């Protein structure tokens, strides 16, 4: 027997003990972090055997005080994972609910929390996650840590392959988790009703998102400009010479000029030839900022002129490039004119 390809019994036992302790500790850590579904690499029942697997369940169950269940998931290509299903950590939930940080918030932080609560109340509640979404999120986290070189697309593809290879018994824990999530969602949102999007709404939503993204990317470039000194109105030099005076001309038969011609020499008509105070270059920027602040306070805290104009589609503008003399207003405006 080649000594390079063989290990002693003591070394094999040492490796098995290390993997056993790592699996037990991983389950304990995830349960303390609030996770009741833990994915372990390899086929744990086959790896440890009958007596060790019962000892594994006992060690993990000591943390929660309830028995745990193991489900082997065949990922294909002789790649196996073991799902450890544990009871929910109610102590973790109570600690999060009674966190002392919420009692020591400043008035400004409390106002920010209230605004977020109002925004969350106005925002439409999301759909409850189904069994596939719950499985994908948990498996994505596990594969990300196990194979850090994989891209998000590759991990999603592998998750889909693993899900299709699962047996009905292996999918049962994820279906139970989805049912539990649905009941919790119903408790938090009792008036929730699923309203699917209309066929044309998804396309409009994507178009609006692209326009908003374009407006967001161009807005900083528009605002990051420097006013040229040439924008400040130039003031002509003041001389000691008196202003021009006009000779009075009477309207006679020989002189066709009317008497009103004297009004054209009123100094107030030509203010640019007289000294004026220079106008600050940032006056226009400050005035525009004040105007936007008033609009934000009156309409919405997230009011944005750039994104507001980006919401309008091309069909809302009747007279655009290529329109002829017979162009008409859109149907939404025809009844008002």
UniProtKB/Swiss-Prot annotation:
Gene from which this protein is expressed: MAT2
Main location: nucleus
InterPro entries (alphabetical): HMG_box_dom, HMG_box_dom_sf, SRY-related_HMG-box_TF-like
Disulfide bonds: none
Name of protein: Mating-type protein MAT-2
Pfam families: HMG_box
Molecular function as annotated in GO: DNA-binding transcription activator activity, RNA polymerase II-specific; RNA polymerase II cis-regulatory region sequence-specific DNA binding
Comp. bias regions, Basic residues: 200-212
Keywords from the UniProt entry: DNA-binding, Fertilization, Nucleus, Transcription, Transcription regulation
Domain of life: Eukaryota
DNA-binding segment(s): 125-193
GO biological process, one term: cell differentiation
Highest classification ranks of the organism: Eukaryota, Fungi, Dikarya, Ascomycota, Pezizomycotina
Region called Disordered, residue ranges: 171-219
Subcellular location: Nucleus
Classification via PANTHER family: SEX-DETERMINING REGION Y PROTEIN, SOX TRANSCRIPTION FACTOR
GO cellular component: nucleus
CDD domains with a match to the protein in the record: HMG-box_ROX1-like
